[in-house]
């Protein structure tokens, strides 16, 4: 500091106050900066580009089920490292990290609740937990949810988002494709509806089993749905895939799914489908949803 700066009066600068964390959210698709409260009110659908932001399972089911009496099922079924598997990291360490990051014990949550007053069993995958992959505990939780629906003669709904089978569990993971398919066959024997909702992304062993076995298969807009990813397919066949390949709209156009439904209309759409499939009176929808 020289003699000149000593003569200058000191200027006090106020500290810039930071914006509290979580107030704003940047859309992953159009990069618009969105007010978090407005986004939640819009069910995590970007109002600018209509991109459907990925949801954790509890937020998903909170949007779908009526407020009030809800019962979580099969939460005591936990993952086990039977193979003592290790790649670049121990499987048990991956599980611990996922449980800490998501505050969940597994990649599937199952609830019994109501939609517009009608009882239902609903399950939702968690893509933030090891990519929503299906291991033995996920398959067992799913089966427990379906068995609960059978025992109480209720419809079953599943929101899928998954990278596929959990490779760290080897054949134990692949067994779940057969297990979930078998228990859904039992549900069908009792003539109880199964609505499968495919969200972004639904891939691998989940798409090749439980996700595609619904009486009605619904997808959210622009969801990636398939077995292998498009890059893997292009490298294998050495051809460029059609535009929009493996996206919801492409699958609807080619007859692989039944409907593409905006998230904000899912609850009313599924409620109407279930009443038709179970020969019940139409649900008493709020005015804004029945218009």
From Swiss-Prot:
UniProt keyword terms in alphabetical order: ATP-binding, Cytoplasm, Fatty acid biosynthesis, Fatty acid metabolism, Lipid biosynthesis, Lipid metabolism, Metal-binding, Nucleotide-binding, Transferase, Zinc, Zinc-finger
Any Gene Ontology CC annotation: acetate CoA-transferase complex
Pathway annotation: Lipid metabolism; malonyl-CoA biosynthesis; malonyl-CoA from acetyl-CoA: step 1/1
CoA carboxyltransferase N-terminal domain location: 23-291
Record's cofactor remark: Binds 1 zinc ion per subunit.
Gene Ontology annotations of biological process type: fatty acid biosynthetic process; malonyl-CoA biosynthetic process
Pfam families recorded: Carboxyl_trans (PF01039), Zn_ribbon_ACC (PF17848)
Sequence positions that bind Zn(2+): 27, 30, 46, 49
Reaction(s) catalysed by this chain's protein: N(6)-carboxybiotinyl-L-lysyl-[protein] + acetyl-CoA = N(6)-biotinyl-L-lysyl-[protein] + malonyl-CoA
InterPro entries per UniProt: AcCoA_carboxyl_beta, Acetyl_CoA_COase_Trfase_b_su, ClpP/crotonase-like_dom_sf, COA_CT_N, Znf-ACC
Domain of life: Bacteria
Localization per record: Cytoplasm
Cofactor(s) this protein requires: Zn(2+)
Job description of the protein: Component of the acetyl coenzyme A carboxylase (ACC) complex. Biotin carboxylase (BC) catalyzes the carboxylation of biotin on its carrier protein (BCCP) and then the CO(2) group is transferred by the transcarboxylase to acetyl-CoA to form malonyl-CoA.
Assigned protein family: Belongs to the AccD/PCCB family.
Subunit structure and binding partners: Acetyl-CoA carboxylase is a heterohexamer composed of biotin carboxyl carrier protein (AccB), biotin carboxylase (AccC) and two subunits each of ACCase subunit alpha (AccA) and ACCase subunit beta (AccD).
Protein name: Acetyl-coenzyme A carboxylase carboxyl transferase subunit beta
Source organism: Coxiella burnetii (strain Dugway 5J108-111)
Taxonomic lineage from the root: Bacteria, Pseudomonadati, Pseudomonadota, Gammaproteobacteria, Legionellales
